[in-house]
Amino acid sequence: MILEGENIVINTGGRPVIPNIKGIENNKNIFLSEDIMNLEKLPKTLTIIGGGYIGLEFATIYSSFGSDVTIIQNEEEFLPREDEDIVNAIRKTLGEKGIKIITGAKITEIESSTVIYNIGEGERKLESDIILLATGRRPNTDNLCVENAGISLNERGGIKTDDHLRTDAENIWAAGDVCGKLQFTYISLDDSRIILDDMNGNRGRTINNRGAFSYSVFIQPTFSRVGMNEKEAMMNNVKYRVVKLPVMAIPKAKVLRKTEGMLKALIKEDGTILGAELFCEESHEMINFMKLAIDNNIKADVIKNFIFTHPTMSESLNDLFSM
């Protein structure tokens, strides 16, 4: 079949990364994020290889169903991109739900549904009913033969694009996960806006003026973040002060009986908000307000005195920015 068009958009998405571990191939006890929800029987025990956001979300899901869940990862540091206090809070909450986390594990082999790994000099075994591979995702560029159109790939194996998502070939754009960049549905949606504007001659919108990047990890409670955290601020020599609020202090959290977590924000001396980290119920809604504030340079004092409805989780931002 041959398809032709005046303009072409490549949006073939991504797929799970399969690590090179002996015993994975043709193992009926190993699942991916794309098929684990099709199980007809709930596993009593589940091992998740990979401690990233996908792994955490599935750990939370299956733990809430009643499975005994263990996360095992090669990296020594758990959630290395996040601030230590946030990581400690998340790890504590996961632990209280019975989710176990093993870091620094060098997995050598999988036998049926048993993970064989080394920590230090000792070999250990982790047995479970099934195993989920959650070791990241990669762009779907195999077999596209994009080189035939003069299109290049980037260092992550995604399609190389400019700020308007144009590829090396005229009138061909790429959007979403296939670009090998931020892999979120809403980023792919915004990619489509950039491309449509570009096709129509409006080149004002680019991938560089989306504003502060926000995301949510749907564990319980949800962890959401936008803008800089402390690690990034220190790395970039940005001066800041930190404000924090325990979720226990939020009236709506008490109504919901969900008082785990903390709220945190970074503020410059002039009141500019650098970033926010919200580990609480409904943070996936609250973070959008924070992105709007950061993108429009709304200062901390404005949010401090903003009139929120009551009782809501959002009104806690009054208290957070009063600290």
What are these regions (language model features)?
Residues 16, 157-171, 252-264, 268:
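FAD-binding beta-loop-beta segment adjacent to the flavin cofactor pocket
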Residues 26-42, 125-202:
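FAD-site-proximal beta/loop scaffold in flavoenzymes
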Residues 15-17, 152-154, 202-214, 238-243:
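A short alpha-helix-loop-beta-strand transition element characteristic
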Residues 37-38, 43-47, 53-117, 122-123, ...:
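Rossmann-like dinucleotide-binding cores of NAD(P)H-dependent redox enzymes
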Residues 218-229, 234-323:
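Flexible, glycine-rich terminal cap/loop adjacent to redox cofactors
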Residues 3-13, 48-49, 69, 126-136, ...:
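Short hydrophobic core segments
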Residues 12-72, 101, 147-149, 153-168:
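Glycine-rich dinucleotide-binding loop and its adjacent helix/turn
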Residues 14-16, 136-139, 247:
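Short glycine-rich anion-binding loops that position phosphate/pyrophosphate groups of nucleotides
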